[in-house]
């Protein structure tokens, strides 16, 4: 774990294909940013992120594809886990397991097992369960729904410290009700963070990735600064241009430099992707066959 010093709240959504992760992300973000159509196949193919300002906090939401879609390979899974790690650095405050109202399926059990295998069981201290299709409770209280749930579902709820809530992402649900749901989720996460001594989730993978990102940002910043100084020098030494032309060109060069610096984090993320992928691949390739057969090996 690592202490959180800023006002950001990093939220990673995980769960099986079709559980409503993208629709939930849109509800949290307060607008339709991610494609959340009802489809037979996964709509979200790649890990994606977006953020919003909310009551003085910056909510960063990372939407992941179904990590255990049976059609996907180890290679694809490693790529998406790598993207998730990079997108949520230096570490998520909450790993939100998105489930449809109903039973706790094998694919969802495998997703939790995968999280434990990659990040360790301590990741469960940062997990919240979010049920979608709240409107289908049809008068039944959420408390009663949990009380009547099967053993598997009760077990994962207990393992997550009974941190759970329900969302209705339906277009029929009012904006005010959706914002109330976001309020409930954020309060649940903030309470969890307090229980974790103000810390977000972090481990060796996240720490190493964040360090690589910072180092790469420094290298890129120096490269761009040196390039800018060299280009400015060439402009200043150009005897065929007036002072007014030089000033205008230098101004444009600085604007171009500022744009590069603004996007330096994203470029650093692209640069280190292969290193993170190789680490995840090495870790999972040794145990992948076990996930494809018995997830219980990791769920215990």
Curated annotation (Swiss-Prot):
Q: Where is this region: G5?
A: 168-170
Localization terms from the record: Lipid droplet; Cytoplasm; Endoplasmic reticulum; Golgi apparatus
Q: In which tissues is it expressed?
A: Most abundantly expressed in spleen, lymph nodes, and fetal kidney, but also present in the heart and the small intestine. Lower expression levels are found in lung, kidney, liver, and thyroid, salivary, and mammary glands. Also detected in the thymus. Detected in T-cells.
- Residues the record lists as binding GTP: 17-23, 37, 133-135, 169
**Keywords assigned by UniProt?**
Cytoplasm, Endoplasmic reticulum, Golgi apparatus, GTP-binding, Lipid droplet, Nucleotide-binding
- GO biological process, alphabetically ordered: GTP metabolic process
State the Pfam families in the record: AIG1 (PF04548)
Chief location of this protein within or outside the cell = other
> Where does the entry annotate site (Important for catalytic activity)?
103
Q: Which residues form a coiled coil?
A: none
State the Gene Ontology terms under molecular function: GTP binding; GTPase activity; identical protein binding; protein homodimerization activity
Q: Does the keyword Repeat apply?
A: no
G2 as annotated region, ranges: 42-46
Chain positions covered by the region annotation G1:
15-22
Biological function: The dimer has GTPase activity; the active site contains residues from both subunits.
Question: How does this polypeptide assemble, per the annotation?
Answer: Monomer in the presence of bound GDP and in the absence of bound nucleotide. Homodimer in the presence of bound GTP. Heterodimer with GIMAP2.
What family does the entry list?
A: Belongs to the TRAFAC class TrmE-Era-EngA-EngB-Septin-like GTPase superfamily. AIG1/Toc34/Toc159-like paraseptin GTPase family. IAN subfamily.
Q: What is this protein called?
A: GTPase IMAP family member 7
The species this protein belongs to is Homo sapiens
């Amino acid at each position: 774990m690592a202490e959180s010093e800023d006002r950001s709240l990093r939220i990673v959504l995980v769960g099986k294909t079709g559980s409503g992760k993208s629709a939930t992300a849109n509800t949290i973000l307060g607008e339709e940013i991610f494609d959340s159509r009802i489809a037979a196949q996964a709509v979200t193919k790649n890990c994606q992120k977006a953020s919003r300002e909310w009551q003085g906090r910056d909510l960063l939401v990372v939407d992941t594809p179904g990590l255990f879609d049976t059609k996907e390979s180890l290679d694809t899974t490693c790529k998406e886990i790598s993207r998730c790690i990079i997108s949520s650095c230096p570490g998520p405050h909450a790993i939100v397991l998105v489930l449809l109202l109903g039973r706790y399926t094998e694919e969802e059990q495998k997703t939790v097992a995968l999280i434990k295998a990659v990040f360790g069981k301590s990741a469960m201290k940062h997990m919240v369960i979010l049920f979608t299709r709240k409107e289908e409770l049809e008068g039944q209280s959420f408390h009663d729904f949990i009380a009547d749930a099967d053993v598997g579902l009760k077990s994962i709820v207990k393992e997550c410290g009974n941190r759970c809530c329900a969302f209705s992402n339906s277009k029929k649900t009012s904006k005010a009700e959706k914002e109330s749901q976001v309020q409930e989720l954020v309060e649940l996460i903030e309470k969890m963070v307090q229980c974790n001594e103000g810390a977000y989730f972090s481990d060796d993978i996240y720490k190493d990735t964040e360090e690589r990102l910072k180092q790469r940002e420094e290298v890129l910043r120096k490269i761009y600064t040196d390039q800018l100084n060299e280009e400015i020098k060439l402009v200043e030494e150009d005897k065929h241009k007036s002072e007014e032309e030089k000033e205008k060109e230098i101004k444009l060069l600085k604007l171009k430099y500022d744009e590069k610096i603004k996007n330096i984090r994203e470029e650093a993320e692209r640069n280190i992707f292969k290193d993170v992928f190789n680490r995840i691949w090495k870790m999972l390739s040794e145990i992948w066959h076990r996930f494809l057969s018995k997830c219980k090996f990791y769920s215990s």
